[in-house]
Amino acid sequence: MKATQFILTALLSMTYLSVFSQTNFGEPKDSTNFKTEINPDFFLLGTLSDYMGRFQYVDREKQIDRYYPYEESIAKYIAKFIKENYRIVVNTVFITSRHSEIFSPKLAKEIHTKYFDEKGRFIDSTLNSEVKKYSFLTGVYYRYGEHLEGNIYKIQVANSPKDKEIYQILKDLECDKLVYKFLRGYIPSSDIFYLEATPRMIKYFNIIGQEKQELQKSYDSYIGKIFEGEQGAKAKVMSNDRQKELIKSLQLIFK
């Protein structure tokens, strides 16, 4: 009863909430002998920031990306990933605030020419194979995702045109159980996808499991500063309780 009441409250309070699904709720594809393969371009593309558009804050000619202080681990990982997969040593710049940026004119020209049009929009037609879609989704999960419980995951992007690619990929890869929430009226506005990941998706997510845990730990530590002090401690308890209720509701929806 309590979970049902929460769902009703959530439905009334959310600006926009929908449950997307395929027409069939069949058995997920077998993953026992399924082999994962990462396409470097599309994994990297999945991680890229595009707040207010890909080139609003990123230099198209020479920059790969920019990162928040809590994303130091991903900046270092991406620099290493590029060196191993492209044989390019990037220029990683850390400023006093611990924000960071990665530069490589050669790689920037390559990926921005191949995968973005003249107006800076991602070329969707390049996502033309399962390997590319899984690779892109894995990159998105690494930077923008969260493992909530069991096979339930969350992906959240802010003021990003990437939302349409995320939804289409989840649909194409037969993610039948998906809840979408749009936070309208917030700064920034956000698109949130709650999903029950398929066994094949989980295999891909596990590739980056250790790195994701490190990033999540850094994020939690960064956000934890908000909950310092007596009032902060109370707010943290309330936040944790809401998270537990959310997970219960998602479990009920996905049942």
Residues of each region from the PLM?
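Extended mid-to-C-terminal alpha-helical interaction segments
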Residues: G209-K255
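Bacterial Sec-dependent N-terminal signal peptides
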Residues: M1-G26
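Short amphipathic alpha-helical segments and their helix-coil junctions
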Residues: T23-S31, L107-I123, I247-F254
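DNA-contacting interfaces and partner/effector-binding or oligomerization modules
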Residues: G46, I64-K76, K80-L215
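Short N-terminal segments immediately surrounding and downstream of signal-peptide cleavage
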Residues: T23-G46
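Acidic/histidine-rich, surface-exposed loop or edge segments in extracytoplasmic proteins
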Residues: Y57-E61
